[in-house]
Swiss-Prot record:
HAMAP family: CitG (MF_00397). PANTHER family: 2-(5''-TRIPHOSPHORIBOSYL)-3'-DEPHOSPHOCOENZYME-A SYNTHASE, TRIPHOSPHORIBOSYL-DEPHOSPHO-COA SYNTHASE. It comes from the Bacteria. Keywords: ATP-binding, Nucleotide-binding, Transferase. GO terms for biological process: prosthetic group biosynthetic process. This is Probable 2-(5''-triphosphoribosyl)-3'-dephosphocoenzyme-A synthase. It catalyses: 3'-dephospho-CoA + ATP = 2'-(5''-triphospho-alpha-D-ribosyl)-3'-dephospho-CoA + adenine. The keyword Transcription regulation does not apply. One of its GO terms (molecular function) is triphosphoribosyl-dephospho-CoA synthase activity. Belongs to the CitG/MdcB family. Its EC number is 2.4.2.52. Pfam families: CitG (PF01874).
Amino acid sequence: MTKAVLTSISQLALKALLYEVSLSPKPGLVDRFDNGAHDDMSFMTFIDSMIALSPFFQAYIETGFAYAKEEPLLLFNRLRQLGQKAEEIMFCATQGINTHKGLNFSMALLLGATGAYLARTPHLMTDLGCFSKEDTLAICRLVKPMTAHLIQADLGHLNTKKEFTYGEQLFVTYGIKGPRGEASEGFTTLTDHALPYFRQMISQNDPETSQLRLLVYLMSIVEDGNLIHRGGIEAWKGVKADMRLLLQQDLSTTDLRLALSSYNQCLINQHLSPGGAADLLALTFYFAFLEKLL
């Protein structure tokens, strides 16, 4: 019974990634219609990546459940080791293309935290599907003590390095903390912004319209390292401003799709991709499935 429940939840994580890549149109991002601002990946590349990562989603939640009483840092280390192996398998599947590196990191922590939370709340194991927004908040809060050390440990000594990863370079140049920052703060962008917004949207609109509006909302608020990496601070600020204006127009679903299609070409021309917003979109979907919003 326990394994079946954990398996079903890990499949919701995979489903969240599938929903994210399938949502269309998404400006600058890979979707069903085109490859956005990416010339090295496609919809099929994302499918290959997800299939490679899927077994690890199961491992993340099972690890959290099995080691729920362990010190948070020790649980983090277990999850990170699994996540690094998953990353290797992902890169093999995509021939070296980074489709889900940051999202895999975040999902490892959130699935691990979900497993740990389930071990402490056995009623959810027998009454699966009754996750509340309070449960979501509690799961995200479990990540905070696991990652309290992370910024200092990973980014505090970069002055001794000569070569930086993409994430390290963003921190050195702009102070952008990326997925590490989200995790160390307990995913407050999710709990305080994305999920409240989506709960409101889904109560008023059909699922696809709600998802598209959520994407626009995230693009208007997220500190998006992908955009900043590709275009700098001003390009990122420009995208945020454009998305705020789009939200204010309160367009019909048909007009919203047309506007997003047009903006997609704009971002393609500038080689801009809001990958940070896309990752948070997928994470929001994961909790939306747990809460039965979708």
